[in-house]
Design a protein with these regions (language model features):
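Functionally important transmembrane alpha-helices
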Residues: 167-168, 218
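Short alpha-helix capping/helix-loop boundary micro-motifs
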Residues: 136-146
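Loop/turn positions that initiate beta-strands
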Residues: 150-154
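Short acidic, glycine/serine/threonine-rich helix-capping segments at coil-helix boundaries
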Residues: 116-123, 190-225
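N-terminal capping segments
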Residues: 1-117, 160-163, 169-195
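Short, basic/aromatic beta-hairpin or loop at an interaction surface
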Residues: 111-137
Length: 225
């Protein structure tokens, strides 16, 4: 069975802003099957399973509430509407708006992580999630390039400015909470074909800057397979 994800995607006109408040076509804030993002995914898993469950639960409720739509210019109106309700978005009854990262911020707040800044966006999401101490970053193609090992409540965010989603169902080989691995620094180990990790990603980034063509691997942190 396909792994499902939920997110705030785009307004009813296929634009980032300017539509009517609230859900207009059942696709502005909605679920879909997991997909491999062209910009690549970074993966964050809550260390506490109950936090992960509440992140997923909030996203599901947002996707089902037709009072919640998409608009980058009004991205904080959902947060303001949900805050007095304990961030239970199922109780929001006035039409409001959010965007992908603002909605993840609301989901984290519902799970008890309320210190994320209003400026929380895909570009700074990794550093902000890491600062909370509540998440483990899962690296390598095992987590970033397939859905098999993903779990309900995982947060996926593009490696450059773009999009973020929350995983709503477990992959077939979901392992539960995973300890944070210490990445190898470039030069600490010999990189070989078939290797993966953050040091591989750094090597690929440096090769790209030098003009090398990496083909299908790009900067996925995967040295072939």
């Amino acid at each position: 069975m396909a792994v499902k994800v939920g997110s705030a995607r785009i307004d009813e006109n296929g634009k980032a802003h300017g539509g009517q408040a609230g859900e207009q076509n059942s696709r502005e804030v909605s679920t879909q099957n997991w997909y491999l993002q062209s910009k690549g995914w970074s993966v964050y898993r809550a260390k506490n399973p109950s936090v992960a469950e509440n992140i997923a639960k909030c996203m599901e409720r947002a996707c089902k509430n037709d009072k919640i739509g998409y608009d980058q210019y009004q991205r904080h109106t959902l947060y303001k509407a949900a805050e007095p309700l304990g961030f239970d978005v199922s109780k929001v009854t006035k039409a409001c708006e959010t965007d992908c990262s603002a909605l993840v911020r609301v989901c984290c707040a519902y799970a008890g992580i309320t210190g994320l800044p209003e400026s929380f966006r895909t570009g700074n999401m990794p550093s902000n999630l890491n600062k909370t101490g509540a998440f483990t970053e899962l690296t390598g193609s095992k987590y970033q390039s397939q859905s098999t090992y993903l779990g309900r409540g995982d947060i996926l965010v593009t490696k450059t400015n773009g999009h973020t989603v929350v995983v709503l169902s477990n992959g077939s080989k979901y392992e539960g909470t995973v300890a944070q691995s210490t990445p190898d620094a470039l030069g600490d180990r010999i990189l070989k074909y078939g290797g993966e990790g953050e040091d591989v990603t750094l090597m690929q980034e440096l090769l790209l800057k030098l003009g090398y063509d990496l083909g299908s691997w790009v900067c996925a942190g995967d040295f072939g397979d």
